[in-house]
């Protein structure tokens, strides 16, 4: 159909959710950006005849990049440069709610930022940055239309899925203290991780539809009589449940590609343009 925007889906894998075999006709592409190199090579290919670009792990192929040191700007810029209209990400997270059990999926709709050391904008006045200052609206950080697709697919597949949740992103790489975990619950956070911020913010600045499939692996450390979060426990739960996130991705991508996103993408582009304050000459 003339005038309909062609969909290309970027995929960012999280801890334990980084299988490049989901793509057909894979081609590795090493790229550079004005902000440096992304976490790993991009893998170009198709999922059910839909063009996709996979960044298999934001932490690097051997999980050598701490959450603080992930080059989020390069990752998002690289996917934008490849023409991605959407970014679907997977992330491990801790649950801050009794009802979100380990192994459950959460389609996140909000975030709380507790990071302290990360570049959060493409417009910060540096030599590689875009001109001006971008005051991007963040009332609805995640793409509602994309989230609806993911929620619908999860229900159809019979996967236990929470249709919303506020993700609090901490700096890491350490896990929370018990006092912090209890405080985050009082703040209204539902799940906790180390990577959603600034990824979701940068995607918004790039005018890309961004949605996150979060998998709860543990109860962090707030819950009495429950084993506190540990690397071993996170990886064990991921190994047992990673197929849930993969199934949602593989089923959702062709449905996303069949929809018309022209109006929404144009609206997002206009929002970015209206959010940038340029210097007066």
Swiss-Prot record:
Residues involved in phosphate binding: 15, 58-59, 91-92, 195
Major localization class: cytoplasm
Pfam families, sorted: PNP_UDP_1 (PF01048)
Molecular-function annotations in GO: S-methyl-5-thioadenosine phosphorylase activity
InterPro entries the record matches: MTAP, Nucleoside_phosphorylase_d, Nucleoside_phosphorylase_sf
E.C. code: 2.4.2.28
Disulfide bonds: none
CDD domains cross-referenced by the UniProt entry: MTAP_SsMTAPII_like_MTIP (cd09010)
GO cellular component, one term: cytoplasm
Cellular location(s): Cytoplasm; Nucleus
Reaction it catalyzes: S-methyl-5'-thioadenosine + phosphate = 5-(methylsulfanyl)-alpha-D-ribose 1-phosphate + adenine
Biological pathway: Amino-acid biosynthesis; L-methionine biosynthesis via salvage pathway; S-methyl-5-thio-alpha-D-ribose 1-phosphate from S-methyl-5'-thioadenosine (phosphorylase route): step 1/1
Annotated GO biological process: L-methionine salvage from methylthioadenosine; purine ribonucleoside salvage
Binding positions (substrate): 194, 218-220
Record key words, sorted: Cytoplasm, Glycosyltransferase, Nucleus, Purine salvage, Transferase
PANTHER family in the cross-refs: S-METHYL-5'-THIOADENOSINE PHOSPHORYLASE
Subunit details: Homotrimer.
Family per similarity comment: Belongs to the PNP/MTAP phosphorylase family. MTAP subfamily.
Protein name, entry field: S-methyl-5'-thioadenosine phosphorylase
Gene that this polypeptide is encoded by: mtap
């Amino acid at each position: 159909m003339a005038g309909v925007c062609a969909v290309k889906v970027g995929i960012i894998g999280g801890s334990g959710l980084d299988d490049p075999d989901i793509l057909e006709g894979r081609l590795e592409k090493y790229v550079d950006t004005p902000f440096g190199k992304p976490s790993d090579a991009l893998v170009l290919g198709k999922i059910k005849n839909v063009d996709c670009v996979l960044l298999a792990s934001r932490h690097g192929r051997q999980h050598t990049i701490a959450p603080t040191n992930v080059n989020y700007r390069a990752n998002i810029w690289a996917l934008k440069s490849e023409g991605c209209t959407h970014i679907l990400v997977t992330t491990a997270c801790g649950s801050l709610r009794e009802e979100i059990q380990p192994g459950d999926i959460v389609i996140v709709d909000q975030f709380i930022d507790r990071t302290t050391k990360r570049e959060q904008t493409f417009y910060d006045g540096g030599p590689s940055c875009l001109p001006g200052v971008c005051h991007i609206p963040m009332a609805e950080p995640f793409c509602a239309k994309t989230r609806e697709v993911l929620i619908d697919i999860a229900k159809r597949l019979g996967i236990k899925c929470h249709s919303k949740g506020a993700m609090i992103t901490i700096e890491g790489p350490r896990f929370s203290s018990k006092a912090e975990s209890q405080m985050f619950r009082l703040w209204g956070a539902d799940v906790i991780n180390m990577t959603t911020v600034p990824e979701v913010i940068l995607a918004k600045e790039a005018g890309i539809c961004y949605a996150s499939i979060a998998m709860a692996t543990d109860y962090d450390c707030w819950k009495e009589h429950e084993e506190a979060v540990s690397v071993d426990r996170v990886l064990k739960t991921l190994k047992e449940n990673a197929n849930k996130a993969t199934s949602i991705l593989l089923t959702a991508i062709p449905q996303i590609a069949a929809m018309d996103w022209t109006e929404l993408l144009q609206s997002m582009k206009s929002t970015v343009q209206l959010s940038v304050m340029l210097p007066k000459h």
